[in-house]
């Protein structure tokens, strides 16, 4: 912004207020630098004071919005471009709402914005806000509908704090592990599995499908798993995993008691690491007619994976192209079979091979759409079988569309308004 309008621009804008001036490459005297700094510091202090006042006004106005629900509904979705999944989920929901003719503001933060500035939401005056992993509800008025989809074990879910829930807050949970956390806080919720973005992930007939199996996703090993007191439980669980243990809820409770470990940590970190990383190592050790390709962060640290490691793919077109080129998509995960990667793969025509949680998980079963494995031999038998049966992805994709999720949101709003 022009230096002569610096104060006004900072006060009424929503960019983060700068902290320092960089004089690099400028041939100016120390005296001039000092004069600039003095003026800059005074301007910044004034801007901070005015910004607080204006934000307070925004918050007060937002809290007291009186909305007219007879007019077309306005939907507000905020996202951060530093997130790897959340921003794309929010964007897909926003795009689906737009396709249905809704008025939508998709507010993508790119790192320069002041996250405490509520200018856009004040100006837009939404009837509905939709958030991923965060409630973002304390500043909302009673009229606003707020939908929150928890897809990760956020700190405010795991800790013992109370969560502020309004009458028009509606919570969705991705996994049974998050169900448990919400139940502990006495928060009502609905189950919502991942959805598929069919605009990015679809059959591409220009890509030749080859006899190969691909894995796309990060390795789960981390420093938090290298502690001695964690290695003991890892060794114990790894032995059970290699012998085909089903890891029912009762079995997990038994392990929690035996090792005095937090159940959420065991399920979201230890089990996820063992099921994913060890399974990929199994895959790379099987000699079959299928070419193996592994993509994602962290796999180059495994010597056995390096010959098959192909780097990191960008979200969207690059991932879709790889899945369109593969016969199988390997997608082992402890908590759930219906991951984003499974949906993306099926939309692109690759048959998923997933870790078998049937019988111990309450998620839907799609035998007609995927292969299941629990042991090394299960995986080997799939890859060594010369007669691969065709799979039907239609039910899986239809039941996990963003259209269906958005319809659920719209139906919830309509029913709530009718019941008032």
Question: What are the language-model segments listed below?
Answer:
Residues 2-20, 143-149, 168-170, 185-192, ...:
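Active-site regions of enzymes building and remodeling cell-envelope glycoconjugates
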Residues 1-3, 58-66, 74-183, 200-201, ...:
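Extended catalytic core of nucleotide-activated donor transferases of GT-like folds
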Residues 19, 30-89, 184-336, 356-360:
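Nucleotide-sugar donor-binding catalytic core of glycosyltransferases
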Residues 141-163, 230-241, 343-352:
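A short, gly/pro- and small-residue-rich
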Residues 70-79, 88-101, 105-109, 164-169, ...:
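Catalytic binding pocket for nucleotide-activated donors in carbohydrate/polymer assembly enzymes
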Residues 4, 9-50, 67, 71, ...:
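C-terminal amphipathic helix plus adjacent low-complexity
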Residues 9-13, 163-166, 203-212, 309, ...:
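Short, surface-exposed amphipathic charged segments that create phosphate/polyanion-binding patches used
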Residues 130, 147, 170-172, 190-192, ...:
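Hydrophobic/aromatic beta-strand patches that form the interior of the parallel beta-sheet core
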